[in-house]
């Protein structure tokens, strides 16, 4: 999918880019796989803001995605490649030979009319899903499960990929895009290939209104707030932070504070941390 560059007909259009959607084959989603999606605007069940800078934006329907890929031995034909407003990756509508329809994350190179299949005996071909133990070393994968049967949780964003490095007993070593090397159970499934729409990260939003269409609200600097709104607020003119280190709006240290649980059980499964050389 290429990048479309706009002419500077207005200030908002200057430097603006977008995807050309050349891979998208239809703009009409499969109705049976749509669910209504209520805008939460960053609020929890108590009505309190738990995620800032969210709200507004275009109304969306949620597309039910098959992250489990557990219909073993049943072939499916790719019918369409579609845009999904709820994620950076594109999605593909597949029709199984038993009549079931499903959406999957569209990997790079997947084409309409292509046949895909899941199961331990599936070929090592883009779009096929297999247990990690059955995938050869060096293969690039995405949509990786962390618990067998739960569905893919890792490597689902546009352009993301991971690589199978080897096998140790019942675990398989996988190198994630961050550089982290992690042990994952060999019975967990993964899909062959890289997630498509890899140029999505190169898009220049161009103007504030386009972020608002996506449901992203403005981010205000703490230094321009009042003291009752942020630890950096107050003072005369452009005042410094006034603290030993920058703080979050709730007074916790910002920039560099480690937030990972030191007793995380998954520590024993991480062979190399992402920030290790």
Curated annotation (Swiss-Prot):
| Family membership | Belongs to the universal ribosomal protein uL2 family.
Keyword set includes Phosphoprotein = no
Show the GO MF annotations.
rRNA binding; structural constituent of ribosome; transferase activity
Which proteins does it associate with, and in what oligomeric form? Part of the 50S ribosomal subunit. Forms a bridge to the 30S subunit in the 70S ribosome.
Entry superkingdom = Bacteria
Spell out the GO cellular component terms annotated for this protein, sorted alphabetically and separated by semicolons.
Answer: large ribosomal subunit
Species in which this protein is naturally found? Streptococcus pyogenes serotype M1
Keywords, ordered alphabetically: Ribonucleoprotein, Ribosomal protein, RNA-binding, rRNA-binding
Q: Where is the composition biased (Basic and acidic residues)?
A: 264-277
Its function?
A: One of the primary rRNA binding proteins. Required for association of the 30S and 50S subunits to form the 70S ribosome, for tRNA binding and peptide bond formation. It has been suggested to have peptidyltransferase activity; this is somewhat controversial. Makes several contacts with the 16S rRNA in the 70S ribosome.
Q: Which GO terms describe its biological process?
A: cytoplasmic translation
Q: Keyword Ribosomal protein on this protein? A: yes
Q: Where is this region: Disordered?
A: 219-277
Protein name (Swiss-Prot/TrEMBL): Large ribosomal subunit protein uL2
State the Pfam families in the record.
Ribosomal_L2, Ribosomal_L2_C
Residue spans making up a coiled coil are none
């Amino acid at each position: 999918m290429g990048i479309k560059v706009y002419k500077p007909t207005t200030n908002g259009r200057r430097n603006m880019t977008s995807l050309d959607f050349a891979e998208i084959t239809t703009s009409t989603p499969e109705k049976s796989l749509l669910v209504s999606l209520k805008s939460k605007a960053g609020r929890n069940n108590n009505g309190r803001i738990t995620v800032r800078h969210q709200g507004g934006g275009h109304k969306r329907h949620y597309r039910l995605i098959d992250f489990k890929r557990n219909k073993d031995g049943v072939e499916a034909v790719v019918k369409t490649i579609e845009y999904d407003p709820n994620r950076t990756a594109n999605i593909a509508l597949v029709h199984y030979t038993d009549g079931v329809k499903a959406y999957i994350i569209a990997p790079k190179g997947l084409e309409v009319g292509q046949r895909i299949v899941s199961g331990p005996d599936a070929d090592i071909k883009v779009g096929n899903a297999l247990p990690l133990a059955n995938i050869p070393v060096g293969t690039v994968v995405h949509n990786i499960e962390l618990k067998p049967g739960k569905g893919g949780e890792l490597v689902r964003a546009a352009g993301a990929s991971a690589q199978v490095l080897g096998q140790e007993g019942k675990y398989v070593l996988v190198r994630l895009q961050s550089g982290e090397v992690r042990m994952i159970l060999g019975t967990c499934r993964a899909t062959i290939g890289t997630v498509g729409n890899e140029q999505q990260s190169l898009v220049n939003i161009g103007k504030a209104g386009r972020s608002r269409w996506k449901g992203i609200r403005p981010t205000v600097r703490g230094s321009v707030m009042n003291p009752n709104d942020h630890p950096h607020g107050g003072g005369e003119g452009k005042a410094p932070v006034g603290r030993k280190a920058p703080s979050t709006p709730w007074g916790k240290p910002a920039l560099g504070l480690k937030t990972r649980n030191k007793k995380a059980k998954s520590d024993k499964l991480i062979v190399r941390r992402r920030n290790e050389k």
